[in-house]
Amino acid sequence: MSSLAPCFTVGSIVRCKTCFGDNISGEVVAFDLGVKMLIMKCPSSNGGGDEQTTCNVTIVNLSLCMDIEIVKEAIPPAEVQQPEPIDLPMIRERYRYATEHRTLSCRSYHPNASPFGQALFRLLVKRFGDPAIIWQNKGDQVAINILRQVVIDAPYATENIRYLDWNPKLAICVQEVVQNFCSKQF
């Protein structure tokens, strides 16, 4: 293959022979000259005849191709449709959600807490809100502190719940959450 790779148009049918002896042919889906990669939609090997509905998507490194042949050049449409406008509010919402989810995952990790305790921590954060739940160090063990009123010691079961300030509504709510979580885990 020459140092200047040919430019492929999307929709063209291309046949490539790799340095490993593989023959790959299919329709061009994407092409990047900078990294010399070609993404092709190849017919699936499970048959299907003329009504072929499944395809394999193959990524070809053009640096490893010995021979490239354009079997059929795609004819560009006379009128190109403009792409749909980007929905920025939706993208911002997805970004916010992903950031919150990763932050929660990072906050729920504690090296001295069991995976069970970390999962309970994440559930409590979803139930009571992010700033309401914190880890509380106790030597080699770590406890979950809820609203600075309730502490759940390891191994994080209903019998390990301690109340610093008695709040009957909070006590019942925390007990139900922990009980439901424990019953689903075992």
Curated annotation (Swiss-Prot):
Domain of life, per lineage: Eukaryota
PROSITE patterns: AD (PS52001), SM (PS52002)
Upper taxonomic lineage: Eukaryota, Metazoa, Ecdysozoa, Arthropoda, Hexapoda
Known role: May have an accessory function in the survival motor neuron (SMN) complex.
Organism, as annotated: Drosophila melanogaster (Fruit fly)
CDD domains named in the record: LSm12_N
SMART domains in alphabetical order: AD
Family, per entry: Belongs to the LSM12 family.
Protein name in UniProt: LSM12 homolog B
Domain AD: 84-186
Domain Sm stretches: 1-74
Note: When it was originally identified as the potential ortholog of GEMIN6 this protein was named 'Hezron' after the 6th generation descendent of Abraham. This protein is produced by a bicistronic gene which also produces the CG6709 protein from a non-overlapping reading frame.
Gene Ontology molecular function terms on file: RNA binding
Pfam families associated with the record: AD (PF09793), LSM12_LSM (PF21166)
Oligomeric and partner information: Interacts with Sbat; along with Sbat and Vlet, may form an accessory subcomplex involved in SMN complex function.
